[in-house]
Amino acid sequence: MTETDGFYKSREVFDPAEQYKMDHKRRGVALIFNHERFFWHLTLPERRGTNADRDNLTRRFSDLGFEVKCFNDLRAEELLLKIHEVSTSSHIDADCFICVFLSHGEGNHVYAYDAKIEIQTLTGLFKGDKCQSLVGKPKIFIIQACRGSQHDVPVVPLDMVDHQTDKLDNVTQVDAASVYTLPAGADFLMCYSVAEGYYSHRETVNGSWYIQDLCEMLARYGSSLEFTELLTLVNRKVSQRRVDFCKDPDAIGKKQVPCFASMLTKKLHFCPKPSK
């Protein structure tokens, strides 16, 4: 029977334009885990500017119809409890799910207030055997964290003029350590603020480059452009930035390029929902 089923499946019409269904009652939940301060024993610096990222993302996701839930500086045990509660709740009437981490990172981990958590532990809670109501639906993880010990050396076209900030107190900082690109499974989309092995930049007033530009693109094209195409625009926007003011002189002039790993199987559009 398995061979017969496979034979008939191979004969099905393949539609390259097929989209995820976004006509459920709810858009879905968007979790934002925001970490500004850390337990002193971790010796991690404060992430000044991260609250601007949190607020910016809250506005953008709310505009797209998501139920946004923000959590600040949770301990690892608290964070795991929150995300387990969401993974075991019903998403049957939801279009999709989003989870955002604004923190420091290292290897295949991100940091909560007092300890690091393996990313695959988090994504694993939303795989089909653990969260059946999200089977076949987009599961988007956005990770704003540093991913290495290198800066991207700029090679700038002669006719390009880089943006200069007017406020000297809006200093650029980097998020500590590194995060690896991780596979998660079908219908997952892993979005990273920077390519593996490089620094992720964050302004102390305006927030991180990646989240600033992601939110700008969501505001302009969030309900009209296919989401991975929108992420490509974000890559372009961030890559056009450079560090102008930083306490580390070696960082001046350096650049950044985000990346995303898509395991989506259809096109993803956040089509506007009918007014209630």
Swiss-Prot record:
Major localisation: cytoplasm
Catalytic activity field: Strict requirement for Asp at position P1 and has a preferred cleavage sequence of Val-Glu-His-Asp-|-
Active site: H104, C146
EC number: 3.4.22.59
Gene Ontology terms describing biological process: activation of innate immune response; cellular response to staurosporine; epithelial cell differentiation; hepatocyte apoptotic process; intrinsic apoptotic signaling pathway by p53 class mediator; positive regulation of apoptotic process; positive regulation of necroptotic process; protein autoprocessing
Regulation of activity: During activation, the N-terminal disordered prodomain is removed by cleavage. Concomitantly, double cleavage gives rise to a large 18-kDa and a small 11-kDa subunit. The two large and two small subunits then assemble to form the active CASP6 complex. Can be cleaved and activated by different caspases, depending on the context. Cleaved and activated by caspase-8 (CASP8) and subsequently by caspase-3 (CASP3). Can also undergo autoactivation by mediating autocleavage at Asp-162 and Asp-175, while it is not able to cleave its N-terminal disordered prodomain.
Localization per Swiss-Prot or TrEMBL: Cytoplasm; Nucleus
Coiled coil location: none
Pfam families the UniProt entry points to: Peptidase_C14
Entry keywords, A to Z: Apoptosis, Autocatalytic cleavage, Cytoplasm, Hydrolase, Lipoprotein, Nucleus, Palmitate, Phosphoprotein, Protease, Thiol protease, Zymogen
Listed CDD domains: CASc
Disruption phenotype: Casp6-knockout mice are grossly normal, breed with Mendelian ratio, and are only slightly protected from anti-Fas/CD95-induced cell death. Casp6-deficient neurons undergo apoptosis and exhibit soma and axon degeneration just as wild type neurons. While Casp6-deficiency is able to block axon degeneration with local deprivation, it is incapable of doing so with global deprivation. In addition, B-cell differentiation into plasma cells is accelerated in deletion mutants compared to wild-type. Casp6-knockout mice are more susceptible to influenza virus infection.
PROSITE patterns registered for this protein in UniProt: CASPASE_CYS, CASPASE_HIS, CASPASE_P10, CASPASE_P20
Gene Ontology MF terms: cysteine-type endopeptidase activity; endopeptidase activity; identical protein binding
Maturation-removed propeptide residues: 1-5, 163-175
Chain residue ranges for the region called 130's region: 108-125
PTM comment: Phosphorylated by NUAK1; phosphorylation inhibits self-activation. Phosphorylation at Ser-239 by AMP-activated protein kinase (PRKAA1 or PRKAA2) inhibits autocleavage, preventing caspase activation, thereby preventing hepatocyte apoptosis.
InterPro entries: Caspase-like_dom_sf, Caspase_cys_AS, Caspase_his_AS, Pept_C14, Pept_C14_caspase, Pept_C14_p10, Pept_C14_p20, Pept_C14A
Subunit structure: Heterotetramer that consists of two anti-parallel arranged heterodimers, each one formed by a 18 kDa (p18) and a 11 kDa (p11) subunit. Interacts with BIRC6/bruce. Interacts with RIPK3.
Function of the protein: Cysteine protease that plays essential roles in programmed cell death, axonal degeneration, development and innate immunity. Acts as a non-canonical executioner caspase during apoptosis: localizes in the nucleus and cleaves the nuclear structural protein NUMA1 and lamin A/LMNA thereby inducing nuclear shrinkage and fragmentation. Lamin-A/LMNA cleavage is required for chromatin condensation and nuclear disassembly during apoptotic execution. (Microbial infection) Proteolytically cleaves the N protein of coronaviruses. The cleavage leads to two fragments and modulates coronavirus replication by regulating IFN signaling. The two fragments produced by the cleavage interact with IRF3 inhibiting its nuclear translocation after activation and reduce the expression of IFNB and IFN-stimulated genes.
Family that this chain belongs to: Belongs to the peptidase C14A family.
Domain notes: The N-terminal disordered prodomain is required to prevent self-activation.
Protein name (database record): Caspase-6
Natural source organism: Mus musculus
